[in-house]
Amino acid sequence: MSLDYNTCVTRYSDQFKKILIAPDYLQKIQELASRIVERKLTEVHHLVDRNQELKRFITGLMGEAALEQLLDINIIDWTVGDSYHYHYPDIPGYKVGIKTVERNKFPIIFKKNWYPQIICIRSDKFENLVFVCGLATPDVLNEFQSDDLIVDPALRKRGTKTGFYGFSRLKPVSGISDLYSYKIGSK
């Protein structure tokens, strides 16, 4: 199956929410990302996967910042530590993660997903622009995936992650009420 970005992503872009991140907040994000990357130099799996690491952390944090604005909650964890301390969903109090990717790339996800992800795209034209695309349920994440979307051969070889292309099945996210069914402790 051939998957191209325009067919899988761009054709749905009129449904995405545009979020501008303030320049001073973007600067704080860049500084945090630098501290994180410096700390990751001590972790073996980060020594193996050094390609564009600073840019990836900035991109991920920008998605979190965009959702902070959209949902009017604090999301970014400003602490720096070992990766194993950070294996939990991104949105505090909710079983919801955030996947942010550069424009013209597909989000990389785990092959088996247990909680939803809000998918975001970082603009390639404006440094501080993020598109909030929508929420992918675990069923959607687990169905619409392809290893062919992984560009990095080393990551593909590890076999734990895959590319996501189910933008046609994303649920819109306009506010925190859209996530209530994923609130920790709710039935």
PLM feature spans:
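Nucleic-acid endonuclease domains
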Residues: 1-92, 99-187
